[in-house]
Amino acid sequence: MKLHELKPAEGSRKSRKRIGRGTGSGLGRNAGKGEKGQKARAGGGVRIGFEGGQMPLYRRVPKRGFTNIFAKQYSELNVERLNIFEDGTEITPELLIEKRMIRKSKDGLKILGNGELQKKLTVKAVKFTKAAAQKIEAAGGKVEVI
């Protein structure tokens, strides 16, 4: 077999749907658009959310809440994910970004307490949950708020 002899597997590629090319093709005449009406016209159709003139759902439902522009955006990481590091490693946000465990965040790193930690680590972060701090210290590690 040569490169120019390669062909896709039988039935793996569908042929293009050629519409409006005569009645014999099976997709002639109305070209799959049914009879007359807005949806049969070129460029026809209604915008998203339009309900035929009835007040649409997105306008019937009341507005609620707001976005707090002062909300802190932390990168969050559970303690169980720190088990990949060797004993005695100093965990910093920079190290975690380098290892692609977190993305760079606006307001720093927050360590959450889900899972178990078996390694003795020094963890530096902006915030820790109570459970996370307890688990790090129980494993013989240190918690440092930066």
UniProtKB/Swiss-Prot annotation:
Keywords: Ribonucleoprotein, Ribosomal protein, RNA-binding, rRNA-binding. Residues 1-47 are annotated as: Disordered. Residues 1-13 have a biased composition (Basic and acidic residues). One of its GO terms (molecular function) is structural constituent of ribosome. InterPro entries: Ribosomal_uL15, Ribosomal_uL15/eL18, Ribosomal_uL15/eL18_sf, Ribosomal_uL15_bac-type, Ribosomal_uL15_CS. Residues 21-31 have a biased composition (Gly residues). Gene3D superfamilies: 3.100.10.10. GO terms for biological process: translation. It holds the Pfam family Ribosomal_L27A. GO terms for cellular component: cytosolic large ribosomal subunit. Part of the 50S ribosomal subunit. Binds to the 23S rRNA. Belongs to the universal ribosomal protein uL15 family. This is Large ribosomal subunit protein uL15. It comes from Clostridium kluyveri (strain ATCC 8527 / DSM 555 / NBRC 12016 / NCIMB 10680 / K1).
